Structure formats: structure tokens, C-alpha cells
Amino acid sequence: MRVRARLEQLFKREEGGIRRNIPRPDLIQACVDRHEALVSQCGALATWTPPESTGRSPLDTLIVRRPESESKIDWDAPNNIPVDPETFTMLVDDALATLHDAEEVFVTDRVIGADPTHAMPVTTVSNRALTALFTLNMFRPIPDDIDKSCFADKPFLLLVCPWDKLDPERYEGRLRVDPRLGHTSTMAVAMDFDDRIGVVFGSAYCGSVKKLMFTVMNFLLPFENILPLHCSANEGPDGDVALLLGLSGTGKTTLSADPDRSLLGDDEHSWGPNGVANFENGCYAKLIDLDPQKEPEIHHACFHKADYRKHGAIIENAMMYPDGTFDLHDDRLTPNSRGSYPLQYLHNIKPESMGGHPRVILFLTADANGVLPPVSKLTRAQAMLWFLMGYTSKLAGTETGVTEPKSVFSRFFG
């Protein structure tokens, strides 16, 4: 496909406008100058997405089906939707063409994973400054010893055009028909595990970027004898690590932000020979009904007062009044309002985001039918069964079309 060679040509274009790894304050300023976000009263950036982009869209999330990985993916699973290589090439071509036409292109070079032995280098290229800022919040700086990583020579490339839309006629018969539109979908979140390329096109929900990379790590790490987990993690004063597994909205971020325990991370981790390590550099917390008395750490991280060029928290789809204050109880836009912020905005964190092997594992289940007791202590066999079964619920707003809790069996709480 020679995508990377074409991208290098783009980076060298005569008209310029390529802004690669620019300082964080300059990136925040670009978000404001380009009207991608507004400055709130506290200094955080407020942004809003189209109604079709207030949550993840599993039906538009696609995996390239190639002979190399054919037998390694459960294609019978409802969320593993295949796309053929030709269609994916079309998506890449459209993304590159869109980026070529952009006056400014924002590029960040980061990694996924705090453990340097399996940190994944990822270059994100977007025509939106806010996407680049989101990657600074959520993806980690490149460590000095990145050469130790099993992925050091296998970097991932992510092309993101969140506000542009695909031509439905061009993709007729290739992508699904979206019943809301009455024609072929104009959105795709697609990934090629073999060529290590991802495309986010038409989804302005910031979570699409982070979840694409989480999916990539979910696929690649088991082949390195590393277990990827959808969980938060914290550590007690004696070094005891706890994992809290659960789907989006079940309380991982809230429960792991404990003033008496150091936070490793709130959503995505690996568990390998060295112990537990956070994938991310920040948090992407649900904000609906956030109470500063009950959740002071998260509230402070999002809404502490600072000069906006030094703030950089992203408040997504929350109701903001003309005076720049927020009403976090107003869910008219979506019950899935979010706040993205770096871990360093929290008071009690473990900076290296790595810990030993967990002593306690908690499964957080949103039980829509009330069939489970509030708390259960599981035997080892029961825990293994529960991990494999993953009974829980999808919660309102976390995915497009989910308006009330919906029971689901999500294997491994992924």
C-alpha cells in the first residue's frame, strides 16, 4: 500500500502547514483559534460533537480480514465486523486525500503502554488540533528505552478525519446501510492489524481514537504472552495492586480514584511477567451527574481553574452556559458526556503507571435485571467462569443507539 511513503510526501509538501509534535500550549491555542473548542470559565476546553458521534459506533467499527490473521480472530463475534482489504485501501486513500487538502495537519508521536517491553509506538495524523491534544492527554510520551519494546520496529499509524464524511455512493455495497440515514454509512472506524494502520473517518467522538488503539493492543498483546484488560488499577501503600474490570460506565474511573491508594490508570492495562501496566497517559471520565463532594479528584482534574493554555482538559458534550460554567446534570445532549485529562492532574497517582501482580480483582457488573447479589466473593473457578462469561450491561450513551441499560455477555469484560 506504501501508505507511509505517501504520508512522508505529505509531510514535505511545499505549502507547509504540517504541525508535528508542537508544544502543548500551542496545540491548545490552535484548538481555540480554529474554533474546534471554546474556553470555559475554569480554563478547560469545551467541545461538542454531532448527534451521531456522542458515543462509540460498534456497527461502524471494522477489522480488515486478511489471510495472515484470518484464523486468529473470532469472526462469529458480533463486534468483529470484517472489511475487505480493497475497501480499507479506499478508506486510507480518502483519509490521505482529506489530509492533503487540509490547510493544517497535526501529527503526534506517542506510545501505548507504560511498560517499555511492550509499548506500542503510534503516530496519529489528523486535520483537527483537538484530536492531537486528545492524544497528548491519553497516549504516553515515547520512553528513552523504547528500543526494548517488542513493537519498537512495528509502529502503528492512525489517520483521523473526525468531522469529514465518507461518500455513501462510493461505499455502496461495501459498508453497512445506516437506517438513521437511509443510505450507506458515512462513518468508519477501521483497523488493519497486519499492516498496522487505523482510520477514523466521520466519527468525532474522541473515544473512537482511544478505543481503536485499545482494540489493536487487545489483538497483538496475547501473542507476546501479555494479557490486555479493560480495567482500572490502583496500588495501596504496601504495594498491593487492585484491578477493577468492567464495561464503560460501570464505575472503573470513579472507584479507582481513591485518596488512600495511588492510581495506575482508569481504563486500559496490560498484565504480564512484570506485573500490571497502564496503556494510557490520562483518563476519559464520564461526567454526567459528577459530584465534586463524592468524586473530588475527577472534578478537580476536569474543572480546576488555570490559564487555558496550561489547562488542556477536554470537556466533551457537556451542557455549558454562556458564562462558561457547566451543568453536569443536564443530559439533553447525551448521558455520555466525557472529560479527558492527563493523569498528572490527579493528586494521588503512581507516575510510572506500573505495579506488581494484583492481589485483588473486582468485576464491576451493571446488572440490569437484578439477578445478582450486590457483592459476591468468588472462588478461583467462579472467577474464571465470570471472566469468560462477562455478564453485565451496556449503559446509556456509551454506544450509539443504547438509550437504556442492555444486558450483554461481554467476554473478558472487553
Question: Predicted segments — roles?
Answer:
Residues 156-220:
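Charged, amphipathic alpha-helical linker segments immediately N-terminal to NTP-binding catalytic cores
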Residues 77, 194-202, 241, 411-413:
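Glycine- and acidic
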Residues 115, 207, 368-372:
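Short, acidic Gly/Pro/Ser/Thr-rich loop/turn segments
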Residues 102-109, 223-228, 263-264:
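Short secondary-structure capping/junction motifs at helix and strand boundaries
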Residues 2, 6-41, 52, 222, ...:
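Glycine-rich, often acidic-flanked micro-motifs
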Residues 1-156:
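N-terminal accessory targeting/assembly segments
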Residues 250-252:
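Conserved glycine(s) of the Walker
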Residues 88-98, 142-143, 183-185, 338-350:
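Short alpha-helical segments and helix-capping/turn motifs at coil-helix boundaries
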